[in-house]
From Swiss-Prot:
The lineage of its organism: Eukaryota, Metazoa, Chordata, Craniata, Vertebrata. PROSITE patterns: EF_HAND_1 (PS00018), EF_HAND_2 (PS50222), MIRO (PS51423). It holds the Pfam family EF_assoc_1. It comes from Mus musculus (Mouse). Ubiquitinated by PRKN in a PINK1-dependent manner, leading to its degradation. This is Mitochondrial Rho GTPase 2. The gene is Rhot2.
Length: 620
């Protein structure tokens, strides 16, 4: 909604434009009237809509044509004033003033116009019969107000209607010639209806209507008011109420009725509560609320966010089979501007026979929140999170984690979403590794590996806690890029156990990107089902890891009758959760060994101290 309103008064000389302004401000009819009033600013706290309002007068005798066009360009609404006792001033509305205001606007939005019949004290009766044909000819005319500056009649109402024409315009909502909602308005209201229909039975129950009413207007409807609404709809729309529930047709009819009766602010209140702008598009402020993410921090859905997206899953799982079919997923996206998740979803999260189970669905939301929180905020906005959850914005569904360096200092992370970069030469099996994390086999896939997504996500358990682990495949060619972002919670360096050259490549990556840092690293020997290749001169993988105090290389193979072991994924998640255990301390035996060494060291020190004591005693 606009932050201020600029009203311009136009009309023939002596129709009372200046008198209207001065009567409004002074609350009395002025005895002496200047040729033109200075611009008046009415503070927000004294206007009905709580918006600052600027009122601008015009004098044909004092201002040029260029100055007039400049004022028209700056105005938000124009009041064309005529003298009810002078028919020639009414005719000038059609022939002069409206062409001046909107004559140069062949297409696009036109300035709203309020017709103002002044000096109603000089003529009995009304001029509405003479004005109605003009209103029918020019749809930009919002309304007509008859008033008297001398008797202070309808002065406040005139400026209220002018404000209303700007803040709650009719033109984007309603086509007066067709006497129906404009397509963009009907589409926006249809989306709002679908969001409010929580049980997806194609009707709003009394409970859903009251929730909608409370969300938009701050209070529920009285039981009698609910019945009155449904009675009006039943009387006017066939099928507007079915099974005592308001249907989409009934909902659209009610909003049409509001507009036809001059209560279009009611429809605008609904639209703006659900994030729409004056152009009937979701505003950037609604879709992308402010969310500060400092460097080194990540973003996750919090409990409110997970509860909401799970609620959306259950709402659209119409057959209650625990998965979203392609049709059910399409229904979920019907309130979006377009389907955000494509066929790559099948190779990104765990799926079930081409359908999306709740587990995979939550994984996808988690991945999106981590990789692109702005997109996540927009998706939550499309689903109506702020309205349906009665929150200020969807930013309240997001948690920003503490900085990674603090995790490293404390030796443990509180993050529930962990990032693992998978690096290695081309052809070592990175794509197969990512798909194995989902329980998929590349052998069964129709697409070549290069067409697979670069991210997969699943859950693993670390010390009894569930963690989301994201595997991110780093393209082999991008490793030559000095600006490559290798930041992660754990690095997986993959080499082909049958091709020693690929290990040399991994060792180079480790030395370049990770050797001097604190990121845990795990070397993985892929294709463990193949014979081991002849190692070139130099350190073997096991010796290299031992020298650099890294865990021993883990073996991995996608071939065989059984699914690949998930132990390696658990190991990666554990290393990411406890980043201070960068070296071999991750193995249970090393904890025991370290304890033994400490105990032995203590015993040796005690023996040496006792022996030294005996020598000193004897020397005395």
């Amino acid at each position: 909604m606009r932050r201020d309103v600029r009203i311009l008064l136009l009309g023939e000389a002596q129709v009372g434009k200046t008198s209207l302004i001065l009567s409004l401000v002074g609350e009395e009819f002025p005895e002496e009237v200047p040729a033109r009033a200075e611009e008046i600013t009415i503070p927000a706290d004294v206007t009905p809509e709580k918006v600052p309002t600027h009122i601008v007068d015009y004098s044909e005798a004092e201002q040029t044509e260029e100055e007039l066009q400049e004022e028209i360009h700056k105005a938000n609404v124009v009041c064309v004033v005529y003298d009810v006792s002078e028919e020639t001033t009414i005719e000038k509305i059609r022939t002069k003033w409206i062409p001046l205001v909107n004559g140069r606007t062949a297409t696009g939005p036109r300035l709203p116009i309020i017709l103002v019949g002044n000096k109603s004290d000089l003529r009995p009766g009304s001029t509405m019969e003479a004005v109605l044909p003009i209103m029918s000819q020019f749809p930009e005319i919002e309304t007509c107000v008859e008033c008297s500056a001398k008797h202070l009649r309808n002065i406040s109402e005139l400026f209220y209607y002018a404000q209303k024409a700007v803040l709650h315009p009719t033109a984007p909502l309603y086509d007066p010639e067709a006497k129906q909602l404009r397509p963009a308005c009907a589409q926006a209201l249809t989306r709002i209806f679908r969001l409010s229909d929580q049980d997806r039975d194609h009707g709003l129950s009394d409970e859903e209507l009251n929730a909608f009413q409370k969300s938009c207007f701050g209070h529920p409807l009285a039981p009698q008011a609910l019945e009155d609404v449904k009675r009006v709809v039943c009387k006017n729309v066939s099928g507007g109420v079915q099974n005592d529930r308001l249907t989409l047709e009934g909902f659209l009819f009610l909003n049409t009725l509001f507009i036809q009766r001059g209560r279009h602010e009611t429809t605008w209140t609904i639209l703006r509560r659900f994030g729409y702008s004056d152009s009937l598009e979701l505003t950037p402020d609604y879709l992308y609320p402010a969310l500060h993410v400092p460097p080194g921090c990540s973003t996750e859905l919090n409990h409110r966010g997970y509860q909401f997206v799970q609620r959306m899953f259950e709402k659209h799982d119409q057959d209650h089979d625990g998965v979203l079919s392609p049709t059910e997923l399409q229904n979920l996206f019907s309130v979006f501007s377009g389907a955000p998740w494509g066929p790559e979803l099948l190779h990104t999260v765990p799926t079930q026979a081409g359908c999306l189970p709740l587990h995979g669905y939550l994984c996808q939301w988690t991945l999106m929140t981590y990789l692109d929180v702005q997109q996540c905020l927009a998706h939550l906005g499309y689903l109506g999170y702020p309205t349906l959850c009665e929150q200020d914005s969807q930013a309240q569904a997001i948690t920003v984690t503490r900085e990674k360096k603090l995790d490293q200092e404390k030796g443990q992370t509180q993050r529930s979403v962990l990032m693992c970069k998978v690096l290695g030469a081309r052809g070592v099996g990175k794509s197969a590794f990512l798909q194995a994390f989902l329980g998929n086999s590349l052998g069964e896939a129709r697409d070549p590996p290069e067409k697979f997504p670069l991210h997969t996500i699943n859950t693993v358990r670390v010390n009894g806690q569930e963690k989301y682990l994201i595997l991110c495949e780093v393209n082999a060619d991008s490793l030559l890029d000095t600006s490559l972002d290798t930041t992660c919670d754990v690095a997986c360096l993959m080499f082909d156990s049958s091709d020693p050259k690929t290990f040399v490549h991994c060792a180079t990556i480790y030395k370049r990107y990770y050797m001097d840092g604190q990121t845990p690293c795990l070397f993985i020997a892929s294709k463990a089902d193949l014979p081991e290749g002849v190692a070139p001169p130099g350190l073997s993988p096991a010796e290299f890891c031992r020298r650099h105090r890294l865990p021993a290389p883990a073996s991995f193979s996608c071939l065989g009758p059984a699914m690949p072991s998930t132990d390696v994924f658990t190991q990666l998640a554990t290393m990411a959760t406890f980043p201070h255990l960068v070296h071999t301390e991750l193995h249970p035996t090393s904890f025991w060994l370290r304890g033994v060494l400490v105990a032995v060291g203590t015993a040796v020190a005690a023996v040496l101290s006792f022996s030294l004591y005996r020598v000193l005693v004897k020397s005395r």
